């Protein structure tokens, strides 16, 4: 079930935009342009319509959000029993391609994180073919004519 509309914040790159819920889930993204079909459309129904959630694995006691001054860089801070972690979301102005960047930054203590990526093209109607599920390298999700390359990494503090 989607979050109430007032719980969403906007990130964008002037050619596309995403809605990020207070729980760390991107529930809406038409990509690579505003007029493209959505690849995350949980806002229309449920997570099975596509979403990308990054959040603490433990119950959250407090959430605060803010935009960095004069930007669409969104910072969501989660407080849990064992610590504090920030999720920083943005879409940089594009060069050759569009990007969604999600950074997790530990602030205090140790916080176990969980990630769920459910790509669904055409507003949740098309389940893409994923060519790799390797945890340490890139993965590609394809459904002609759409495709998404997912890369990730863990940086030491």
Please describe what each predicted stretch is.
Residues 2-157:
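Beta-sandwich/jelly-roll carbohydrate-recognition scaffolds of carbohydrate-active enzymes
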């Amino acid at each position: 079930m989607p979050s109430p509309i007032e719980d969403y914040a906007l990130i964008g790159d002037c050619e596309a935009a995403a809605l990020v819920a207070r729980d760390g889930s991107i529930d809406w993204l038409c990509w690579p342009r505003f007029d493209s079909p959505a690849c995350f459309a949980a806002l229309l129904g449920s997570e099975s319509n596509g979403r990308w959630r990054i959040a603490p694995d433990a119950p959250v006691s407090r959430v605060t959000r803010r935009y960095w001054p004069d930007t669409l860089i969104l910072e969501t801070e989660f407080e849990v029993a064992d610590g504090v972690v920030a999720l920083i979301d943005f879409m940089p102005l594009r060069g050759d391609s569009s990007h969604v960047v999600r950074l997790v930054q530990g602030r205090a203590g140790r916080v176990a994180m969980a990630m769920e990526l459910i790509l669904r093209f055409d507003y949740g109607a098309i389940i893409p073919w994923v060519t790799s599920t390797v945890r340490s390298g890139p993965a590609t999700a394809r459904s002609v004519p759409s495709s998404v390359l997912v890369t990730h990494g863990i940086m030491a503090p």
